[in-house]
Amino acid sequence: MGMRMMFIIFLFVVLATTVVSFTSGRASDGRNAPANNKVSDLIRQFCCGHYDCDFIPNVCG
C-alpha cells in the first residue's frame, strides 16, 4: 500500500469519526436537556448572588 492510499484511508477514518461524533452529540442534546436546565438553575441559585461569579453575565444578568 502506498503512502497516498494510506493517507486517503486516514482521511476517510477521520471524516467518518467526525460525522458519527457530530450526529451522536446532536442526538443526545434532547435527552440531556433536563439535566442542563437543572445545572443552570443551580448556577442561578448559588452563584448569581456572589460577586465572585461576575464572569457569567449571560446567566446572572
From Swiss-Prot:
Q: Which residues carry this modification: Pyrrolidone carboxylic acid?
A: 45
Annotated positions of the Cysteine amide modification: 60
Q: Which GO terms describe its cellular component?
A: extracellular region; host cell postsynaptic membrane
Q: Which cysteines are joined by disulfide bonds?
A: 47-53, 48-60
Which keywords are on file for this protein? Acetylcholine receptor inhibiting toxin, Amidation, Disulfide bond, Ion channel impairing toxin, Neurotoxin, Postsynaptic neurotoxin, Pyrrolidone carboxylic acid, Secreted, Signal, Toxin
Which residues form the pro-region? 22-44
Gene Ontology molecular functions: acetylcholine receptor inhibitor activity; ion channel regulator activity; toxin activity
- Could you tell me where this protein is found in the cell? Secreted
The UniProt entry, under Pfam families, shows:
Toxin_8
Annotated tissue distribution: Expressed by the venom duct.
The UniProt entry's sequence similarity note says: Belongs to the conotoxin A superfamily.
Q: What does this protein do?
A: Alpha-conotoxins act on postsynaptic membranes, they bind to the nicotinic acetylcholine receptors (nAChR) and thus inhibit them.
Please give the record's comment on domains.
The cysteine framework is I (CC-C-C). Alpha4/6 pattern.
What protein name does the entry list?
Alpha-conotoxin-like Lp1.6a
